[in-house]
Amino acid sequence: MQVELADRAAARPSETGEAPPSSPAAAAAASAAAEDAPLLPGGGGGVRRRVVVSERFRQRSGSFRREVRRAAEETYLLTRLTLILLRYLGIGYRWIRQFLALCCYTFLLMPGFIQVVYYYFFSSQVCRSVVYGEQPRNRLDLYIPTDRTGLKPVVAFVTGGAWIIGYKGWGALLGRRLAERGILVACIDYRNFPQGTIGDMVEDASQGIAFVCNNIASYGGDPERIYLVGQSAGAHIAACTLLHQAIKESGEGDASTWSIAQLKAYFGISGGYNLLNLVDHFHKRGLYRSIFLSIMEGEESLQKFSPLVMVKDPAARSAVSLLPRIFLFHGTSDYSIPSAESEAFFDALQQNGAKADLFLYDGKTHTDLFLQDPLRGGRDKLLEEIVTVIHNDNPDTSAQHLAVPVARRLVPEFMLMLAGRVSPF
């Protein structure tokens, strides 16, 4: 079976994002020097102050105009893509029912969402929309621990969203919780369908990982301790990215901007790993076959983008040996993506020589592990497992990070229970 993925980004620069930040102390000193410039003439001091203020005003005005223009462009793009998507969806009742359920679900969890959104936009720990590539939505958000001493372990997170509604902001709650435990988090955005297909999503994820590997030290992250995490569709995209990179490195592939060896482990949360088994399942739940096959670039590409199939391919045996440790998490009451997906992927990994662990959570649904449980507060078993693995790799981890703080409740229990009943996931 042909399992190699053409390197769509070979002709493009590997790093087109923001330059790493300069020293905060240097920036503060420069700002203070400008503010303290003399107002009286003599040696040109007054002129210098007026020029600095005028230049700063022009820069701010230009920046504001750029933001307005970008917002207008993104609004237009979103509207156009929505219309395209609606043409794909047609008037089938299943997706309409799912959409209405999603609205009810969102309303019931709104008390928690409001608090997370406030944190996302106003916390000094969040560095939003760092550019990592040339394509639309090639942005990532950084969640930086308050303790800036030393380099921190890093999580590169690929969010879910059924390959259609994924957004880097969905990782805000996870980013916050991990940052509280001394872990720097990079939430990678990527093109969704119909703006891109699965090949574009994998390409974007790969470029985002490359940016993290090559630049995270400038933000206080440790390039020797990077962990890849994916949830739902993001778990599938991240697993595909990981395997395609391993296949490239094990063969005669082109030179890449990052290496599998730079990742300490992969955590897959509620992921789907065999698309051949999921086509009919998704169709029954409202993600119609025609749309799903369009996302996956046709029925002939399902095997190429099925991590379980790739792992079983004898031609990929040398690539599997390059994989980092793999940890899979799944709820047994997940109806969006059955837990059998993680179980089968775990078995295939073990049978082909990969180091893998599987954690099943009785009675947990598709969103319990990632959303309802963190909003509930208290002990978060999934988060504890991830944090334990990361900090166990660092014998010098401080006691304050090993002692997991108890998170406060963000949504009343009765609203969480109702949300669980109406959840479309």
Swiss-Prot record:
Locate the compositionally biased regions of type Basic and acidic residues: 1-10
In Pfam terms, one family for this protein is BD-FAE
Q: Which residues act catalytically here?
A: 232, 334, 366
Where is it mostly found? Answer: endoplasmic reticulum
Task: Output a single Gene Ontology CC term carried by this record.
Answer: endoplasmic reticulum membrane
Stretches that traverse the bilayer:
99-119, 154-174
> Membrane topology type, per the record?
Multi-pass membrane protein
Q: Which domain of life is it from?
A: Eukaryota
Protein family according to the UniProt entry? Belongs to the AB hydrolase superfamily. Isoprenylcysteine methylesterase family.
**Its biological function?**
Catalyzes the demethylation of isoprenylcysteine methylesters.
Q: What is this protein called?
A: Probable isoprenylcysteine alpha-carbonyl methylesterase ICMEL1
